[in-house]
Curated annotation (Swiss-Prot):
Any Gene Ontology CC annotation: cytoplasm
Family as reported in the entry's similarity comment: Belongs to the SHQ1 family.
Name of this chain's protein: Protein SHQ1 homolog
Native source organism of the sequence: Caenorhabditis elegans
GO biological process entries: box H/ACA snoRNP assembly; protein-RNA complex assembly
Amino acid sequence: MLTPVFWITQDDDALLIRIRAPHGNIAELDYDHGDYMFVFTCPPYFLRLHFKQMVEEYGSGNGSVEWKSDEGEFHIKVPKMHKKEHFSNLDMITELLTPSTTHHQPHGNQLVEEMDDSEDDDEGDGSEFLVEQQPAAEPEEPKSDGKIEKFGYGFGWSKFGVIERLRDEIGKIVDILEPENVEIEKRADKLMEFDWENFDEGRYLADTLEPEEELLAVISSKFAQKLEISDEDRTKLKDLKKSKTSAKINGNDVEIMTSLIDIVFGYCYDQRVNDWESACESGWNCAKLSPSLSFFAKFSSVKECLLACTRRALTYPLYRSFQLTQRVIQDVCHVITAGGGRPALLHILCDLHRIFIESGEFRYILNDLMIADYIFWIQTVPDEILTRIQTDLTEISGKIDKYDIGWDLEVLEAEAKLANTQLDSDDEPDN
C-alpha cells in the first residue's frame, strides 16, 4: 500500500484533510475516524493518522467527503469532538503517521500490541487499521557505550565508527578527520584552533575595507527565504524511514537544539548569498559553515555556537564579512522565532536532506549522521525547548561584536587602515 501525500487545515469545528490519490480506485474508498485516529483506504493508498486531540466518530452526521477529480484529491471533513479546540502540529507529517502508545483505534479497538517473534500470529484480527505504513529500519551493529559517550558524533553525539569505516571513500567531507580520536568536550577548542590556522587576513580585510557592490547587495537583501512545508517536503516526510539511533545520546534536548542552530546558520548563509535559492555550491556552504556538520562540535551556550559559526563564515566561503555574518544571525533568529518555528525548521531540514543528496561528494552521509534524525526529532521536541532557544536567540542577536571572536579583528583592521593611509601619503606629490 502507498502512503499518499496529505495536508491538514482546521477551523473551529473540524479538521479539513486533503489526500492526493490520483490513481485510487474510488469504488473501494473507505474511511473511518473516532477518538484520536483517522483511517483512509482507497487502493493502492492507505493512510492512518494519529492526533493528540479527539475527533468525532464516523457516522455522527457532521463529516463529509468530496472527490476533486481535477486535482486527484479527496477532501474529507472530520469533526472535532470539542469545538474550538486547537489541534497542534498538523504539519508534523511523521508525527501524525506514528502510532500513539496510549490512544485507541476508532470505535475503541485497541491498537496492535508488540509481540515476541516466537508467538503464533496466524490468527490475526483482520484489521486494516494495523497495516504498517513504514518498514522497520535495519538494526545497527552495537557500539561500545564508553566510546560513544567519549567520542560520539552525529545526532546527539550518538554514533561512532562511521567516518573511520568510510574515510577512504568519502575523503574530507568533514574537517575533523579522526573524530573517533577527539573527545567531544575538546572539539569546540580544536575547532577554534583549526579555523584560526585557516583564517586569511587578506581576504577578510578585502571584504571588510573594500566590499564589492555584490557583497553589499547580499547584506542589504530583504529576507525572502521560503519557510512553508512544501509538497516535496510532504512526500519526503511520508517516505523517510527512521533509523535506529543509539540509546547513548550524549546531549540533552537543549544541546541538541543548540547544535541545530549552527546547521540552520549554514543554510541561511547559503540562501542569502544565492538570492534565496539553492545553487551548485549549496551543499559545500551548508556543510562547511556548520560546526556541527563539519566538526561534530558541542556547545555550552547559544552565544558560543554563534561565535563558532561566525568564525567559520569569516574563514571559508566566498564572502568573509563580519557584517554579513550578523545579518545571517538575524535570519536564523527570524526563522526560529518569528518565521514559523517548528514548521520552518522542518522545511529547512527537508531541504538540507535534498541538497546533500544532490550535491555529490558523499555528503548524503551527513543525512544519515544527523539530518534524518533531526527531521524526526524536531517534530516531537517539547515546546518549552523551542521557547527556551527562541528566548536565548532573541537575547543574543545583535549583541555579538568583533572582540568576542577572539582574533583581534579590530586591531587587524586598524593596522590595515593605517598602512593604507601611509601608502596614500607616500603617493602624494611633494610641494
